[in-house]
Amino acid sequence: MNPQKKRRQDSEKQQLILQRNSQLHGVLLAALLAVVLLVFGLVNLLHTKRDFSENENRKLQAYPALTPASVLDGSFMSKLQSAFADQFFARDHWISAKLRIDQLIGQKESNGVYLCQDNYLIEIPEAPDPAVLDRTLTAMKEFAAKHDDLRMTAMIVPNASLVMRDYLPANAPAHNQQEDLFTVNQALSPCMQYADVTLALKAHVRDGVFYRTDHHWTSLGAYCAFDASAELLGIETPITNYRVHVLTNSFEGTLASKSGKHTAEDTITAYEPLGTDVSYYVLYDSTQEKAGSVFVDFALDTKDKYTVFFGGNHPLVTIKTTANNGKILLIFKDSYANSFVPFLIPYYQQIVMIDPRYYYDDVEQLMTQRGVTDVLFLYNLSTFSADTALADTLGAAS
């Protein structure tokens, strides 16, 4: 046989063998991938489903029921995708693993949270919807005009992204909340007092006015705001001496859950005023439950330990005190108020707290029944800018 022809045949045989091996490898890889996907699918379907994520502090999406209506309106596929993501096997471990990889390659952000110096986690602020913000401010101005005989104050608290701007990663893009605060101040100042606590918080940043792992201010931050606004609130001689109690050293907040970074724990403290004989009790109006303290101890055994203040948010809470001075304070609030209100207790005969997100009754009627003399709007800026419930509540009262 011609040697050249033989070499060509040998070459063709080798190519055929390589081609068959390549096809076999492809089949094996495809089979292996199918087995892996099948195993993961079965594990995801068979492992114990969770209703709530302790780490993320939120309710998880359950697998939806398949109905013709849910298929037609698209809700079935939407909920199914959310359920696959929420119920994924070992989800918390995958989130933590992703964060570690991101940090190794220099990422300074995780799921909308900046990973900042000194182990601080700071939520990335969003620019407000001008229409939503304008609607809220208009409702507040109309409410103030209707009740111009009352002492009315707005305290819109800047978030850590503004107060602790120096802690953000270098060149990190972040919406400047200072412009939003200016807009709010300009809108409200003609019709009510405006308590700007930005400088008071900035002055004590290194003392810890925000939690490292949570979006709330600390009890110290709340005290700094109280001290800066007391005169504006009509408190002539505010208490300056407190005994500070440590409630827990193991608080991991919502930003640790959201980012997946669990490398720090926060301390929650309570400030006990000294030199006052004013006593009080708390009434949770929706349940008619009474309590002798604003602090709910069992909350310290839960994931969301910040709910030690009043047990979290409620539609309506009343604090009745022995300060027989006729001052009745109505507060429209979010959760920032929960750690602020304890500082107000010695100075009012009654404090009425409304969380508009959960309150649906007639505010006007409530104000008349309680004989309200003072009103305070207390929100953090991020919540306030996106909130629609306050305008609805005030609109119902107008």
Locate the predicted segments by residue:
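Extracellular glycan-modifying ectodomains
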Residues: 1-398
